[in-house]
Amino acid sequence: ARTFAELLDAPLAIIEKRRIGNSDRAELMNVIGEVKGRRAIIVDDEIDTAGTLMETVRALEREGVTEIYACATHGVLSDPAIERIRASSLREVVLTDSIPLPAEKRLPQITTLSVAPLIGEAIRRIHRGESVGALFSSEVSFTQEMLLWEDGIAKTLDMRGVPIETPARP
């Protein structure tokens, strides 16, 4: 979340929460930071049942946030996550395809980004004896370009897998 805030030149707010016992259930405590009248991006490692996500959405709405987006690396999306997301005010939920999303769980609100370019670049770096860790250093991981081979032609892709137009090399 801190890296996103820095890249977007936006303030960071934190939702304080604590786990209840040894369960997966979390209790939200406080919104730390000024969020009234702002757009919020909730950043988490995974969304399972979306219970904590929905509590976070409600807390942000109470604090006067105008639009809410969420992103997570892993979309487990166990029941009742899909119904919770569908019924929520979330504008968009961005996930990676680290866990396949079955057709019945696809919603217009959910955007899935491929991790294939990242994995491909990690494999290329391992093969060439280059640093894999550098892929995950704060700003580099969001702006890293990758050189991939397709049909014998080098293609440069951004981290979303979108081709980047590059000038011809002499």
Residue ranges and their predicted role:
Residues A1-P170:
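PRPP-associated nucleotide enzymes
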